[in-house]
C-alpha cells in the first residue's frame, strides 16, 4: 500500500497549486456574485421580489443543464471546460457591471445575463473536482480533497463578508467589476494547469450521452446511494439556515441578531475547514461509508437535542459540532464518488450528482419555512431526522467489492 503524503508535499504535484488557487478565486467570485446581485437589484430597482428572481436566475438554469454540461466536460476535457466557465463568468459579470454604469441595467437585461452566467457554472464546479483525481496520485487524493473542501469552507466565510463590504464601500457596479477580475485571475491561474484531454467519445450526441449519464447515476448503487444520502444531508442544512435566524431573533435585538447569525455561520465555516483538513490525515480510502455515517449521526445529535434544547450555548456547540463533521463527510463523499466512477464518465457524474445534492438544501429550507410558524423545536427535530435518514442511506451503499460502473 502506498503511504499518504503531507499537505506540504502536495505542492510538488505539477499544476495542483495553480488549480487550487484558480478554484479559490472562482468560488470566491461565485459566492460574492449571488449576494452582490441581490444588493445590485435592491440598489437599482428597490425590489426584493426582483432580487429573489435574479437569485433564481443565477442558480437554477445551471442545475437544469448540468447533465449536458457534464457530457461537454467529458468530451472536451476538464481543463478546457473549467476555462470556458471562468472566461464566460468574467464576460457576463463584466456586462452586468457595465450595464449598471451605462444606465442599461433594466430587469430583463440583468436577468438574462444572470441566466447566462448560471449556464456555464456546472462546467467549473464539476470540472475542478474532475481534474483533481487526474492530477493527483491515489495515495494523495484524501489530502487534495480535504484542501478542496477547506477552500469551500473558507469561501463560505469570506465571500459574503467581502461582497457586503465592497458594495457598501464602492457600490454594486464596482463590486461586480472586482468579482469579474477575480474570475479573470482564476482563468490566468488555470493556464498553468496541464491540459487534460476528454476521455469520452464525441461521436454520440450530447443529449444521448446526457441521458446515459443520468441512467448511470440512477443505476449505479454507489452513485444512487450518495445522491439520496447527500440530498437528505443537505436538507438538514437547508432547515438550519431558516431556523437559526429565527432562534437568534428570540434572544437578541434585530441589529445584534444579524451580527450574531453572521458570526455563527462564520464559526460553522471555520469548523468545517478544520474538520476537512483533519479528515485528510484519516486515510478515508476504503472507510468512506463509515466516516460519512458516523459524521451524519453526530450531526443529527448535534442538531437535536444539543442545538434545540440547551439555549444559545447549546445552539453554538451544536452548530460547531455539525460544522466540524461536515468536513470529513464531504472529503469521504468526494473520495468515494471519484473511486467508484468510471473516469470516462466522471465529468457528467460529478455534474449531475452535485446538482442533485444541491436540490436537498432548498427543499429543507422550504419545509422549514412552512413548519416554523408552528414550532421551532420541530424544525430541529426535522433536521436531525434527515441526517439520520442520510446515515441510513449511506450504510446502504455497497462495500468496496462492488465494481466500478
UniProtKB/Swiss-Prot annotation:
**Which parts pass through the membrane?**
32-52, 53-73, 84-104, 108-128, 150-170, 171-191, 237-257, 260-280, 291-311, 314-334, 352-372, 378-398
Q: Which UniProt keywords apply?
A: Cell membrane, Membrane, Plasmid, Transmembrane, Transmembrane helix
The UniProt entry lists membrane topology as: Multi-pass membrane protein
Coiled-coil intervals: none
User: Where does it sit, as one GO cellular component term?
Assistant: plasma membrane
Instruction: Describe the family membership recorded for this protein in Swiss-Prot or TrEMBL.
Output: Belongs to the major facilitator superfamily.
Enumerate the PANTHER family for this protein: INTEGRAL MEMBRANE EFFLUX PROTEIN-RELATED (PTHR23513), STAPHYLOFERRIN A TRANSPORTER (PTHR23513:SF11)
Query: What name appears for this protein in its UniProt entry?
Result: Uncharacterized MFS-type transporter y4rN
